[in-house]
Structures are given as structure tokens and as C-alpha cells.
């Protein structure tokens, strides 16, 4: 299925296999995702299930959003997310229903989407792994400078996309083909092998792997 869930990164730990091997895992807390809308080909041009999770104070929900949540009969959440549906998929879903960690199973391969940690304005050495220039040998000002960023009269410009200093992090990042080590339906937890983008407490979307 292409249906995933939205959870929160709880942190990292390790678990041990039967052979005694230690596996680093990310723990993702997945509260039941409340279905707010089912999009159809006839009304929206594509099929998708829209969900929300968490809660938000009523004073922070505008009238349009409040009406949208009320129509589905669900509590206002901290955001809305969509999962595309293939033909014949999600026929058993309905607005007001819930998606839980039970949509996944142990050993399944998934993609994790999160917002990476913001690093602020960074130079080329940190942002792009540029090599540093000489510390001595006559170099007194350009230790971490990028060096030449172009050529001469031809082309007479700096090409678009040139790697330079700038804002680093705080961008949507997808890590593909992570394995679900354990599904804990009782405590609404997913244990995913390896690292997942973002800070502890950040929202993470877990969905079946595209390239598995």
C-alpha cells in the first residue's frame, strides 16, 4: 500500500538481535492519524487520503480549518498531510476513521520524510565539504574562502547553482529504503533502522518505499 502515517521522532536507541548484534534504531511515536478527507478523481482530479494528527488550541484554528475538521468529525490537528491512493486502494477508508502503525509490518522497507536540522548561514567548508586553503605559506586571509567562482570575460557570469556559502539545513529531506525493525501497536511506536531526518520531537512521515 502507498498509505503511510505521520509521527514524531522520539529519539534513537539500540536493540539487539538474537545473534547479539546491536542495531541503531530511531523510535517514532505515531498517534492514530485521523482521516479528515478522502479525495476522489471526480471532485479533486486525483485519489488521496488526507490525515491530521496531534491537537491544536481552538484559538489557533481559523474558521476554514475548523469547518474542515468539523465536517469530518475529527479534532483539529497540528497540520494536514496527504497520501496518494492507487486505483482500488483505500476502499475501506472513510472520513473520521483512523490510520495506525498497524498499516506497517516488521521487516517492511519504508521512506522517511522530515525537516532537517537548521544550521543557519554556513560557509562552503561546512555546507559543501570544500577543502580548506593553506593555513600558512603566505595565506593570511583566505583559509576558508571558496576560491574562484567563475572564469573570465567568457562566460562573464557565475553559473546558477554554484555551491557557495548560504543557509544550511531546515529543508525537507527524504531518506529512502529504511527497514522497520519492530512495530509496537500497543504503544503506537515504530522502530526504524538507522537515522531519520530532523530533530527530536519533529514531525516525520513514514510511507512505503518507492524504490524497494
UniProtKB/Swiss-Prot annotation:
Keyword rRNA-binding belongs to the record: yes
Highest taxon in the source lineage: Bacteria
The keyword Ribonucleoprotein appears for this protein: yes
NCBIfam families (alphabetical): L3_bact (TIGR03625)
Database matches in PANTHER family: 50S RIBOSOMAL PROTEIN L3, LARGE RIBOSOMAL SUBUNIT PROTEIN UL3C
Key words of the record: Methylation, Ribonucleoprotein, Ribosomal protein, RNA-binding, rRNA-binding
Main function: One of the primary rRNA binding proteins, it binds directly near the 3'-end of the 23S rRNA, where it nucleates assembly of the 50S subunit.
Protein name: Large ribosomal subunit protein uL3
Species name: Marinobacter nauticus (strain ATCC 700491 / DSM 11845 / VT8) (Marinobacter aquaeolei)
Gene Ontology CC annotations of this record: cytosolic large ribosomal subunit
HAMAP family recorded: Ribosomal_uL3_B
Assembly and binders: Part of the 50S ribosomal subunit. Forms a cluster with proteins L14 and L19.
One BP term from GO: translation
Residues with PTM N5-methylglutamine: 153
Molecular functions (GO terms): rRNA binding; structural constituent of ribosome
PTMs per UniProt: Methylated by PrmB.
UniProt family annotation: Belongs to the universal ribosomal protein uL3 family.
Stored SUPFAM superfamilies: Translation proteins (SSF50447)
